[in-house]
Amino acid sequence: TKYQLQTAPGVALMKNDPASIQDAGNQGFIQDASFATTDDGGTGGASYDNTGHAKLVGVLNGFFFIDNTTKKPTFANNVAASQAFGTNPNTGSTNGFAFVNNDPFQEYICKADAAISQANQNALAYNCNNNDGSNKDGQSVVTLEIGSNNADTSMFTVIGTAEDPENEDITAAGCNVKVVMAAAARLYG
């Protein structure tokens, strides 16, 4: 689904990061929820708490904007903080679009930063680690923050291993796990 993306966002946006809609400041625009402080001044990343901050709408899946230098339509995996867009000749707007996977039951693969106990699968919700602006080819490199979990206020629920033979041991840091947006953290569904 397309969401409005403000020109010159306060923090970067990266493909595969959790997303929410700004509920203060420039209300209604999409924002990356993996940074410690989000565009609307809320708390994201490892300290995210859905009781006082914008709920998740999904996971970022790419961006479209008019490049401010070349004036060409651009599809990208990320948008840098403070990146200004050019004026769209079709709409007259300097805003762009973010494409978001917003199915509340969509499963995602995420790398855990620590071991996960079998008892905590399907029981607790976890946040992602704070995004510090690092990326791999424009895509997110954040991991699931296993040290902070709360079934009522965190972002994602682990539903199983990713069945990746080289990375499916949940007793080891770096295992790949399947997650869904935690029911209490999502705006839709």
Go through each PLM region and give its residues.
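Surface-exposed, low-hydrophobicity beta-strand/loop segments enriched in small/polar/acidic residues
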Residues: 1-189
